[in-house]
A protein has these predicted regions:
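Short, highly charged C-terminal tails/helix-capping segments
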Residues: 136-164
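Hydrophobic ligand-binding cavity/cleft-lining segments
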Residues: 1-38, 163-164
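Hydrophobic/aromatic beta-strand elements that line small-molecule binding cavities or substrate pockets
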Residues: 9-10, 55-61, 88-97
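Intrinsic-disorder/low-complexity, polar/charged segments enriched in Ser/Thr/Lys/Arg/Asp/Glu/Gln
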Residues: 3-9, 44, 54, 67, ...
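Beta-strand/loop substructures that line and gate deep hydrophobic ligand-binding cavities in soluble
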Residues: 79-128, 145-147
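Glycine-rich portal/gate segments that line the openings of hydrophobic small-molecule binding cavities
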Residues: 28-82, 163
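Short, intrinsically disordered, mixed-charge
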Residues: 21-29, 64, 128-132, 136-140
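Hydrophobic pocket/interface hotspot
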Residues: 19-23, 59, 70, 105-107, ...
Length: 164
């Protein structure tokens, strides 16, 4: 697999343990419509926005307060030609000590490259979920995940309200 991908780097005043706990609380920052387990090696979960995006993801590496790595096992998008663009990509959350005692979170979706038809939408979406929702969960205790009943229009409007 290529090491190319999309990345987001953020710094926090919170401890590595607090950042880690927020990362594995996927329902707290990505979607409340996640089924399955999201905290330990070999856990699998499903992310679903009906008729738009469906992913089955396995945790392949989990080191508390240091990293979480997901492997996308299956993926379908309704809005691109190659619906399986994410399949076999890797999503990494790497936590480390930064300057002045701050905690650094480096998110990388390895394999999500500009050549993918979904790249612009996916890059923007990760910017919202990791750059805004996960950040809010880490700093305030409350993220901005998709609600179980949200459709794509509601999700898009929420992203635009934060970006705009």
């Amino acid at each position: 697999m290529t090491e190319q991908g999309t990345s987001i780097i953020q710094e926090f005043d919170q401890t590595p343990a607090k950042v880690f706990e927020a990362v594995i609380d996927v329902r707290g920052w990505w979607s409340k419509n996640i089924t399955g387990s999201t905290a330990a090696p070999a856990d699998e979960f499903v992310y679903d926005v009906p008729d738009v995006h469906h992913s089955r993801i396995r945790l392949v590496d989990v080191v508390p307060s240091q990293r979480v790595v997901w492997r996308v096992l299956d993926n379908t998008f309704s809005f691109v030609q190659d619906q399986a663009e994410w399949t076999d990509t890797e999503i990494r959350f790497e936590i480390s000590a930064g300057a002045d005692g701050r905690t650094v979170l480096r998110f990388t979706h390895v394999g999500l490259v500009p050549e993918f038809e979904c790249y612009d939408v996916c890059h923007k979406s990760w910017g919202f979920y990791v750059g805004h929702s996960l950040r809010k969960l880490i700093t305030t205790g409350t993220g901005l995940p998709n609600e179980i009943t949200d459709d794509v229009e509601v999700i898009g409007a929420r992203m635009e309200s934060v970006a705009g």
